[in-house]
């Protein structure tokens, strides 16, 4: 047995592979090891010196001592030097070899196959058939690459690539599709000239059929446009037969490739089955229509704005419909400032003798003719009216308000007597005894022909 046999592997008849650089060469005739020895001398002189017992060439640095004469290699012929240069791979070849090793390692790792599969004669024959110049890595190199894949999170990703874009970035949003759906996706890609039929046949052979979510809506619309149909799904049955001929043919060609891969019997889908597959695919991947928000309208939205409501009136039809639908409720009691009060009932409307200036004229206002006067313990008077519907009280219109006033000079502790007001007149009586600091006059708050609006007022004394 040759001394250098430990540096080589016999991969097939008439060929050997160097364990150091993975170089593959032809063996010598009749079991001669001359090609292996020649390769070791030229490319691995140190390893060859270990088994041969000779000293490898050494390089010394210039020192103060006289220079020593280095051993000179024997002169080689020109043809041998040229052959030696051809044996050394270039940088581009090394990059290609590393990429091949990486792909083989990924294939073995994802399929759960052992690393020594690279020594299998059938596996080597397949790779040699695809590329006669391929440099097949050894099992040790594959194991090293597998370890690096396990440490690298990007290389260790088992995310299957998309059959449309080939995206295999970890964590990209994708969906797993069936064989029929994948064939329809690829059919749409072929019909829109984004893939050739050969590329579609190759993509259907993926182990896991996944599609990125961002392709779903795009190819759904593309299939609509290709078939010449509108956005409604109901008219797919009304399309002519010639609209499905091209897609039907491409669909069967792509699906046959998948059936061949899975060792299934080759079955072609007829036109009715293709239409059923297509309709189900378009329905399952149809985008959902977003629900628009519907704002609820309230009573306050139906009424006018309250910014300048003094000269506005409530619509007649609106309140007529509102009053017919709602029952009469009890009036809301006016919230008193003090809990202790004395009730005093007066059948006359409550007005102040100094609530208007001398030049003001009485105007018709919708105040009720009869009001209940409440006299508090501290001398304040509160007037309130009978019931109004809660919808009117909460409709955004002013129902209860307060009039602030002040007088010049001292005021008596007892309130002034209120003069009587005729029943047919519902306005303020002007009086020149006391000036008015502020007066609020609200006209036409309600239509008197519709309802006798009854409002409550609160005044400070």
From Swiss-Prot:
Pfam families: Lin-15B. Signal peptide: none annotated. It comes from the Eukaryota. One of its GO terms (molecular function) is zinc ion binding. InterPro entries: Znf_BED. Keywords: Metal-binding, Zinc, Zinc-finger. Residues 404-423 are annotated as: Disordered. The keyword Metal-binding applies. A zinc finger (BED-type) spans 1-51. Zn(2+) binds at residues 18, 21, 39, 44. PROSITE patterns: ZF_BED (PS50808). This is Uncharacterized protein ZK673.4. It comes from Caenorhabditis elegans.
């Amino acid at each position: 047995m040759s001394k250098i046999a430990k540096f080589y592997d016999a991969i097939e008849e008439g060929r050997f592979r160097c364990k150091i650089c993975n170089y593959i060469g032809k063996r010598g005739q009749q079991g001669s090891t001359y090609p292996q020895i020649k390769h070791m001398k030229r490319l691995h002189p140190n390893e060859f010196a270990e088994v041969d017992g000779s000293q490898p060439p050494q390089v010394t640095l210039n020192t103060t001592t006289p220079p020593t004469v280095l051993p000179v290699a024997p002169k080689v012929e020109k043809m041998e030097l040229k052959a030696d240069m051809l044996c050394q791979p270039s940088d581009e070849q090394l990059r290609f070899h590393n990429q091949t090793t990486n792909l083989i390692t990924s294939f073995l790792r994802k399929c759960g196959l052992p690393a020594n599969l690279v020594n299998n004669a059938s596996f080597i024959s397949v790779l040699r058939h695809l590329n006669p110049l391929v440099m097949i890595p050894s099992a040790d190199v594959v194991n090293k690459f597998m370890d690096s894949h396990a440490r690298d999170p990007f290389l260790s990703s088992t995310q299957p690539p998309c059959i449309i874009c080939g995206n295999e970035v970890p964590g990209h949003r994708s969906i797993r599709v069936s064989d029929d759906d994948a064939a329809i996706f690829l059919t749409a890609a072929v019909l829109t000239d984004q893939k050739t039929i050969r590329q579609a046949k190759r993509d259907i052979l993926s182990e896991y059929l996944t599609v990125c979510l961002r392709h779903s809506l795009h190819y759904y619309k593309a299939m609509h446009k290709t078939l010449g149909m509108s956005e409604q799904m109901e008219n797919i049955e009304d399309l002519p037969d010639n609209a499905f001929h091209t897609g039907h043919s491409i669909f069967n060609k792509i699906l046959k490739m998948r059936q061949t891969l899975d060792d299934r019997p080759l079955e072609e889908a007829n036109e009715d089955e293709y239409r059923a597959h297509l309709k189900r695919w378009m329905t399952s991947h149809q985008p959902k229509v977003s629900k628009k928000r519907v704002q609820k309208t309230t009573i306050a939205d139906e009424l006018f704005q309250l910014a300048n409501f003094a000269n506005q009136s409530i619509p007649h039809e609106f309140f007529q419909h509102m009053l017919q639908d709602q029952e009469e409720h009890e009036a809301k009691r006016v919230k008193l400032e003090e809990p202790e009060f004395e009730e005093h009932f007066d059948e006359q409307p409550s007005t102040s003798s100094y609530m208007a200036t001398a030049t003001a004229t009485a105007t018709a206002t919708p105040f009720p003719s009869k009001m209940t006067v409440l006299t508090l313990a501290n001398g304040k008077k509160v007037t309130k009216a009978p019931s109004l519907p809660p919808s009117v009280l909460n409709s955004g219109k002013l129902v209860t308000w307060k009039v602030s006033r002040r007088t010049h000079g001292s005021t008596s502790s007892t309130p002034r007597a209120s003069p009587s007001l005729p029943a047919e007149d519902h306005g303020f009586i002007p009086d020149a005894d006391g000036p008015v600091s502020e007066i609020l006059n609200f006209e036409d708050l309600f239509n008197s022909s519709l309802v006798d609006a009854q409002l409550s007022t609160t005044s400070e004394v």
